[in-house]
Each structure stands twice: as C-alpha cells, then as structure tokens.
Amino acid sequence: MTLPVERSGVDSAKSYGFVIDNRKCIGCHACSIACKSENEVPLGVNRTWVKYVETGVFPNTRRHFQVTRCNHCANPPCVRICPTSAMYQRADGIVEFDASACIGCKACMQACPYDAIYIDPETGTAAKCHYCAHRTDIGLEPACVVVCPEQAIIAGDMNDPTAEISQLLARHEVTVRKPEQGTAPKLFYINGNDAALHPTAVERTPQTFMWADVLPLHAGEQGSGGAEERGSGGAGETRRLADSQTYPIHFGGRVAEQMVQVAYNAQHKMPWHWPVPAYLVTKGIGAGIFMIFGLGVGLNWFPFDGLAAVVAGILTVLLIGLTTALLVFDLDRPGRFLYILLRPQWRSWLARGAVILIGFSLLVGIWWLLETAAYSGWLPPGAVATVRPLFLWLGLPLAAGVAIYTAFLFAQAEGRDLWQSPLLPAHLLIQSFMAGGAAFLIMDLFMALPRHLSLTAVTIFAVALIADLFVTLVGEFGIPHASEVAARAAHEIRSGRYRNYFWWGCIVLGHVAPLGLLVVGWVVGWLVGWLAAVAAVCAFVGLYLYEYAFVMAPQEVPNS
C-alpha cells in the first residue's frame, strides 16, 4: 500500500529511482559489498549483485556487466500480494519492507518478476534493496552509489529536473528489465545489453560460475548435476541464439553476437514446494464434497440422508483444516500466522483467501454440529431441516470461493506467467467437482450411501474428469501462451523435467485410468463400488502430480 505522507514522513512529491550507466561499470562488485556491509545482509543472499554475461566466440568476445537489484517499481506487484503490508510503497516511491510484519509466506518472491526479494536466513522474513532508506531520509545517498569508483550508479529524485538522474534520463536512451510485466520499473540502464536484460536468453542451471560453486536448484542434486539431469547444457555452456522461436531475442548479425553465456549471477532457489500443491488438492476435495452435497440436496438430485450429511460435513471440516495446516506449515514464520487476520492487506488474495477459508470452515462446522445433533437425536430433525437450506445455499458460494481463490492469488504472482491463465478459475472449479465426486465414491465403499447420491457422484466425477482432461490438454497447454516465459514453463511440464508427472501421472493415472475403470464398471454393472473407488484414488494421485508440476515448473524459469 502507499503510506500517507504523515505516516511515512517522506515527501510525496518525490519519486526516487536508479540509473545504471553500463558505459562506466567495471564489474568490481564494490556495490554488492557496500550493500552487504551497510545493511548487514547475511551470507548466501544478496540485495544487489553484478551479473556477468559473456558474448561472442574467441577471439571476438566481450563481457557485459549488469548491476541487478530491486527496481522500486511504480506499480509494485510485491506490495499488492503481501497479505500483511510487510511490503509497502512509500510516498516517495521507495518500495520498503517491514520485517516485524512479515509472516514468511514468500508470495512477494513469486510476485517479483526480477528475483529481487529473498528470505533472510537469520530472521525468516522477506528482505531486499530498500534504497538505503535510513540514509535517504537524512539526505545521504545509498551506500552503493557512494562506493562506486566509476560513478556508474546514479540515484535521485526523478521528479526533480535539476537532479543528475533526471538529466541522464532526458539525454540518453535507457532500457529496463521486463517492461511487458507492467510494473513500471524505476531502475534504468544506459547501454543495457539484451543478453543480460533477458534472463531466458540462456538456460537457468549453469555448469559453473566464476568464483562460485553452482548450487543445485532442487534438493538431492549435486552441484552442476542439475543441468545434465534436465537434459540441457545450462548457462555455462555456450549456446546459439539464432532461433527466435526458441528464445525471446535475436542478437545481431555478427558471429560474436550470436553466442552468449552467463559467467556469474546470484543464485535463487524455489520459494514454494510440495505443501502448496498439497493444499490445492485438500481444499479442492473439501470444497467439492460440500458443493456436490449442497447442490444435490438443494436441487433434489437425491434425497437428503442424515448419515451422509454428517460424514460429508466432518470430511469437509477436516480437509479445510488440513489446508490451513499446510499453509501455516509453509510459512517461514509460522508463529505469526495470525498476522494475516490481525493486520490484513485487503488487496492480497492471500488475505482474502484466509477470510474465505475461515468463513467457510465456520459455516460448515456449525452446519455439521447441527446435522450431527439431529442425527444423534439431540435436536429435533424438523428444526434442523428448517435451517438446512440456509446453510447449504450460503455455503455454496463460499465453497466455490475456496476452490478458485488461488487462481486470483496466482494472477497476482507477476513473476510466474504460466499461473496467470484466464482459464485457471474454471479449471480449479472443475478439479474441485472431480475431487468431490471422487471422495463420495470412496465414502460409498465404507458406508451405504443412498443410490441416487452414489449415481450423482459418479456422474459428476466422470463428467468432471472429461472436462478437466479437455481443459488441461487443450486449454492450458494446447493454446499458444501469451508470453515466452509462460511457454517455457509449459514446455517444462510437457517435455522437460516434469513430463513424467504430467503424462504418466496426470494424464494416464489421473484421467485415462479412472475413465477406463468407470467404463469397465459400467460394462460389468459395478459402476459404483470398488472399481469406482480405485478410479477415485487414481484421480487424487493424478491431481496432486499435476498440481505439483504446475506449481514447480514456472519456478524453473529464471527471473534474473
């Protein structure tokens, strides 16, 4: 959020930015060292660093330097997605962070298209370049500006026409990183090099770096082994970039400009791992169970059954509770999880989603208690039947919200283009119906559900399986993507590291096998029974494997 002037204590007429003059930069890393010293940045993470990119073939070679850091965007996505206002934009345009408010959800890292944010290993909170705000507020320049021996870093108020930065911006043609993301970055480069500005010009995992070991991107990998495992040469290998269908840019016409490799860069690991796809599955199942039962009873698809209501209610509550537990488990500061309710930032779909989850849990919990009391004879069944439609119809939009709110959260993750699919809300809703139908089929194996309920569940399950298969193959991966970054992530799922998760896990195990089992059950007359339950289990496993690939693959694509 933008802080009011009286709270931030800064001049709202100012707009601070940086200019990096690549004509002067010698790649000495003095700025990186000064930043670490001034801000006490721990080892292993960086607020500013110098990226080295080499182009050409010996003897026609050249090394390009690029000082990389937070862009202090005029339209910062990290601020919008932060659920507790730990990331905020000052009135003078500086994007600042408040470590005391951070819960370590890592959403800001997914929202930043520049890899500028990291989790401090000592505090477990998000941090980044903050324009040395403690110095700026007393009239001093950032430490990196002061220490640069070539005056290659220029900082100042871009709204002041007499400032050096304003004059440089007026006189020189400048470039920024990823202008297509719509963040309006305020870190400008004079003589910016295309190969350095575009992180997708080379593969993410290099074979080696100057002065640094290459850390594995994934747990269990050894050093540079990640590149071989992925079947690519990595950034350390010299690669031709003439094919514009494969890479986003085409470098000149000379031989020396058609080869590129990254000699040094700061290394970044994936912020989100298995708990996120697991929570997508658990909340989808819980919401799907309630939606199917609520719609079925409300629209008279099947008669109400007290035992089915009790079991459906407790399963929904437990699954949404497990969803909440997974979300808290994934926080780097889980002890602060209540901050999302005590100091919410309402533009964030993390904050909105938390309220939806809590509201849905409370409503379903009360409904389940009433149904349990009526089924046990503690309350008159007629009294509960009177209020039942109110709970079911109020719960339906909340259940749909639980199923799809993550699509809007992913849309705020500006650093992961594949997640910003306009089909994602519908896709998550279909997956929820599929998972809910599968849950009822497993329930039917252990308890005698009314036949109409079982048939409704298997019908919804089959239709949702077919719809999900169509949306996955045609909608998400069959239609050209809007950006090269999204296309690379989709390629990673279809043909790269996650191809087995996708084809054998999602498509074969999660869709083809369940549909085949349902067909066999229909032919032999066992449409509802153990065959359907096995199909449901296959669908659950396939759904998790798909969500795992969908969450992890976009994080493979580098942002810096």
List where the protein language model places each region.
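Long, contiguous internal "core" modules enriched in hydrophobic/ aromatic residues
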Residues: 273-274, 278-285, 299-304, 344-348, ...
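A cytosolic-side transmembrane-helix exit/cap motif
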Residues: 474-483, 550-560
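Membrane helical hairpin/interfacial module
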Residues: 292-295, 301-356, 363
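Ferredoxin-type iron-sulfur electron-transfer modules and their immediate structural context
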Residues: 1-95, 100-105, 109-111, 115, ...
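Flanking helices and flexible, charged tails adjoining ferredoxin-like Fe-S electron-transfer domains
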Residues: 1-9, 53-69, 100-101, 109-111, ...
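C-terminal ends of transmembrane helices
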Residues: 326-336, 406-418, 547-551
